[in-house]
C-alpha cells in the first residue's frame, strides 16, 4: 500500500489564521491529479508543531473526507501520551496509516525509543511508519532499534531522512525479511534509495510538481532508470530551492506563486527572503509551473 510519491502536505491558513478547509481540499485534488499514490497531512511540512490538538484533528478529518488516495497522518509527538491520542483519533477518522516521528528534544535512550513506539503500536491497530529525521529531532534512531521495531506486526515501514545512504542500505539489508517498507524522507535522495530497494518518498516537492515526482518514482520502481534519472535531474534544482530556508518556508511560498492555497506561515517561522524567493521563482519558471 505504501509506495510511490506521497506529498507531505502543506497546511493552508486563512487570513484570520484558521485552517483553510477549501484550500486544503483544492491542494489535495491538485496532487491527486498529478498522480501521487498517497498524501501525508500533519507532518513537518504541514506545520504540525504550531497546530493545536483540535486543528491537528481537523486537518486529518478534511484529508480523509476528500482524498481518493491513501492517507498517512502524522501523529507523532515527543509526548507518548499525546502521540497515542493523535494516533487513536487518526485511526477513528479512517486513515490508512500513521507517521510517527521519533520523540524530539527529549532524546530518549534506545530503551525509551522502543517503549515509545511499542506502546503506541500495541494500543492502536493501524499500520505505522517510523520517521527518522535527526536534523529536526536532535537524535538519529539507531539501526538496531529500527530493525527491532520492524518486527512489530503493525510497524510497517520508515521514512528515512538522515541523509545517510549507508545507513539506509543497512536498514534495507536487515529488514528484507520483515516486509518492511523504506521510504525516502529527502526528495534529492529518492532515486538512489529506490535503487537500493526503497519503495518511494514522502515528498516536499510533490506539493508543487506531483506529476514529475510521481513520474520519477514510478519509473524507478519499474526499473526504467533512464526516465527516472532524466526526471530526477529536471527537478533537482527546484528541490534545492525548496530547501534554501527551513521547510516549509519555501514550499509555502512556491504554492502561493503557482496558484495553490497557502496562506501565511505561523510564528516562529517567518517569510522567505526576497533573494531566496527570486531564486525559487526562477526554478518554478524553468519548469513551466509559474508564468
Swiss-Prot record:
GO terms for cellular component: cytoplasm. CDD domains: DHDPS (cd00950). It catalyses: L-aspartate 4-semialdehyde + pyruvate = (2S,4S)-4-hydroxy-2,3,4,5-tetrahydrodipicolinate + H2O + H(+). It is an enzyme of class 4 (lyase). Its main location: cytoplasm. It comes from Methanosarcina mazei (strain ATCC BAA-159 / DSM 3647 / Goe1 / Go1 / JCM 11833 / OCM 88). It is found in: Cytoplasm. The gene is dapA. The active site is at 131 (proton donor/acceptor), 159 (schiff-base intermediate with substrate). Keywords: Amino-acid biosynthesis, Cytoplasm, Diaminopimelate biosynthesis, Lyase, Lysine biosynthesis, Schiff base. Catalyzes the condensation of (S)-aspartate-beta-semialdehyde [(S)-ASA] and pyruvate to 4-hydroxy-tetrahydrodipicolinate (HTPA). Pyruvate binds at residues 45, 202. This is 4-hydroxy-tetrahydrodipicolinate synthase. The record marks 44, 105 as: Part of a proton relay during catalysis. GO terms for biological process: diaminopimelate biosynthetic process; lysine biosynthetic process via diaminopimelate. InterPro entries: Aldolase_TIM, DapA, DapA-like, Schiff_base-form_aldolases_AS, Schiff_base-form_aldolases_CS. Signal peptide: none annotated. It holds the Pfam family DHDPS. Homotetramer; dimer of dimers. Its EC number is 4.3.3.7. Belongs to the DapA family. Pathway: Amino-acid biosynthesis; L-lysine biosynthesis via DAP pathway; (S)-tetrahydrodipicolinate from L-aspartate: step 3/4. GO terms for molecular function: 2-dehydro-3-deoxy-phosphogluconate aldolase activity; 4-hydroxy-tetrahydrodipicolinate synthase activity. Coiled coil: none annotated.
